Amino acid sequence: MPELPEVETSRRGIEPHLVGATILHAHIRNGRLRWPVSDEIYRLSDTPVLSVQRRAKYLLLELPDGWIIIHLGMSGSLRILPEALPAEKHDHVDLVMSNGKILRYTDPRRFGAWLWTKELEGHNVLAHLGPEPLSGEFNGEYLQQKCAKKKTAIKPWLMDNKLVVGVGNIYASESLFAAGIHPDRLASSLSTEECDLLARVIKAVLLRSIEQGGTTLKDFLQSDGKPGYFAQELQVYGRKGEPCRVCGTPIVATKHAQRATFYCRHCQK
């Protein structure tokens, strides 16, 4: 599933082609996504794009009369293409732009979403989200307050959007490795110093992934059709049985809440 770096990479890639241009019309080939494509999107015509923003894993296209909320789901990607390029099997939504470009949404598993809202505030998919991990609000003090009485393992807690948004399976595993924290540790067992380190490491890992265009493991592509290159820098995720790049101990894979977790027994305590 695309996580924060992949969604931010998509935002940065599509923004220059959308802001200041006008949506001539939307071409919906298959509106049966996780939730049906909103009727308002079908009716778009001669609508300027004012901004392209991100909240958590949602892309937000600001229009004069409302917002398009896009979620990439498990396998979605957005590309900027020449208008004449033929669609393929899993290309479900096109926004045809006045500058001769198309914003094309591709999603083999159709678990993403294209929604419409007049106002972002209070929308059900955005209403109960925690802070952005790259914001000043997310720091060691905040993390310690939220972990202090939490009797659950730190790995699934990091992936809870009520704690912090956008830290999914890949980046939770990578951040815990970088901080030297075992994923099975109770959140409440983390010291002040560990919380401070973990908050800083999460920011660093996410920023590095954004610099590399995100992580492509299967379906994710940047807006220009290229893969994300952070996969080449993964320390533990997807490396079961391979030697730790730091100490040589084989990487272990377990499951938390049906999600694969990767860690080094020697480096993470």
Swiss-Prot record:
One protein family per Pfam: Fapy_DNA_glyco
Gene3D superfamilies found in the cross-reference section: 1.10.8.50, MutM-like, N-terminal
InterPro entries with a match to the protein in the record: DNA_glyclase/AP_lyase_DNA-bd (IPR015886), DNA_glyclase_Znf_dom_DNA_BS (IPR015887), Formamido-pyr_DNA_Glyclase (IPR020629), FPG_cat (IPR012319), MutM-like_N-ter (IPR035937), Ribosomal_uS13-like_H2TH (IPR010979), Znf_DNA_glyclase/AP_lyase (IPR000214), Znf_FPG/IleRS (IPR010663)
Molecular-function GO term, any one: zinc ion binding
Assigned EC number: 3.2.2.23, 4.2.99.18
Family classification: Belongs to the FPG family.
Protein name per its UniProtKB record: Formamidopyrimidine-DNA glycosylase
Primary gene name: mutM
